[in-house]
C-alpha cells in the first residue's frame, strides 16, 4: 500500500506510474494528483491490453512494463481494489494501491 508521502514523491520517480481510475468528470470537478494519468476503471482492462503506441497516443505516456511500479488511486480508496485485481490478472507484478486516494490527498494538501 502506498502512503501520501510516496505519492507526493512520484514526480521525482519517472519510472513510477500513478494511475487515477476515476471518471474524467470526477477529475474535472475535483482536480487530480500531480503526475497521475487518468485511466477510468471501466477502461483499465482494455487500456492495459493496448499495444505500446496506442497506449501512448491515448494516455500521453508510454505503456507500463509488466514489472513497472504502478500505484492506483481513485476518490476514496474503493475502486483501487478492483484496479489492482485487473492489473495483476494481466501479469503486472509491481502494483500497489493508495488507499487514502483523492480524499486523503486533498485533505493533506489543503484543497
From Swiss-Prot:
Domain Rhodanese span(s) in chain numbering: 12-110
Classification via InterPro entries: Rhodanese-like_dom (IPR001763), Rhodanese-like_dom_sf (IPR036873)
A Pfam family the protein falls into: Rhodanese
Entries under CDD domains matching the protein: RHOD_HSP67B2 (cd01519)
PANTHER family per the UniProt record, alphabetical: THIOSULFATE SULFURTRANSFERASE RDL2, MITOCHONDRIAL-RELATED (PTHR44086), THIOSULFATE SULFURTRANSFERASE_RHODANESE-LIKE DOMAIN-CONTAINING PROTEIN 3 (PTHR44086:SF10)
Gene3D superfamilies: Rhodanese-like domain
Organism: Drosophila melanogaster (Fruit fly)
Protein name: Rhodanese domain-containing protein CG4456
Transmembrane segments: none
PROSITE patterns cross-referenced by the UniProt entry: RHODANESE_3 (PS50206)
Keywords linked to the UniProt accession: Stress response
Covalent S-S links between cysteines: none
Keyword DNA repair annotated: no
Amino acid at each position: 500500500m502506498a502512503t501520501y508521502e510516496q505519492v507526493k514523491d512520484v514526480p521525482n520517480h519517472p519510472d513510477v506510474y500513478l494511475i487515477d481510475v476515476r471518471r474524467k468528470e470526477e477529475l474535472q470537478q475535483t482536480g487530480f494528483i500531480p503526475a497521475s494519468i487518468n485511466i477510468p476503471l471501466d477502461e483499465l482492462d482494455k487500456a492495459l491490453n493496448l499495444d505500446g503506441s496506442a497506449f501512448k497516443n491515448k494516455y500521453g505516456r508510454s505503456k507500463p512494463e509488466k514489472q513497472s511500479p504502478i500505484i492506483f488511486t481513485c476518490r476514496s480508496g474503493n475502486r483501487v481494489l478492483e484496479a489492482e485485481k485487473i492489473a495483476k490478472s494481466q501479469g503486472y507484478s509491481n502494483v500497489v494501491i493508495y488507499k487514502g486516494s483523492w480524499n486523503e490527498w486533498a485533505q493533506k494538501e489543503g484543497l
